[in-house]
Amino acid sequence: KLSMVSFMINRFKNIEIKKVLIILVIILFAFSALFSLSSNDKIAILEIEGVIKNPKQYLESMRDISEDDSIKGLIVRIDSPGGTVGSSQEIHESLIKLSNKMPTVASIVDIGASGGYLIACGTSHIFANSGSITGSIGVISQYYNFSKLIKFLKFDIETIKSGQMKDIGDSSKALTNEEKRLLNSLVKDIHNQFKLSVSKTRGLTDEEINEVSDGRIFSGNQALEMKLIDKIGGLEEAIIYIEGIIQLPNLDLEYFPKKEEKLLDGIIPAIDNSSLLNMLNKKLYYLYSPKF
């Protein structure tokens, strides 16, 4: 009887030991999986550089970032004087949507002006260096008048149009007073759209936005005083800020757009920019464009 009891006790112990071992294995596996996931977490850095004429590569990058569950935050690294109105607005709106999913921060390098600044306003927090150039909240549109040159060269240009305003901005003739009035109205409307976007995202009063929206530029220090940015700092400060929000330190960084995309998209505009037609296209710009 004693041997039977001893056998049962030993068997019970073996069963309990097995259970404990199984539980330990499960716990270790869970911790290993958790550690693996956390070690793969990262911050995306979206680099926006140069004059913005086509938002495609940036929109595609933001879609990739949004669909990647390992990306816990986004830093938009801006070094741009702005660009075309529609492109700047598309990127701005896409960033606002992305900000609802993850923390987003803008980091202005040398310049984040006009459309570049509008893009920064699509994020939840804006950093700039003390000497960065920003602001330039305005609209510009330039039309070339080659009518005197055409007359000198004795060229004849015949235009057949369906309406009085169909050839507005045609470089072969000067703008009429009515055309100037129409274009001024257009610029004013788009300028008001810019002001509304900035005042809404930055929480500015009508008086505050009117004070900074005449097209003037600001240094980072001045922009901080005018509530156009949140803090003075560069990429490191932006990373620390994001990590503080998501409570995950020392995250990996993944840069967008990918290098092959940037190379391809850089070649095509370079070819396009060599064309005389590019100089003559009729577009409105959120662009800081000093004549040096």
PLM regions: where:
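N-terminal organellar transit peptides
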Residues: 2-106, 110-114, 123-129, 142-292
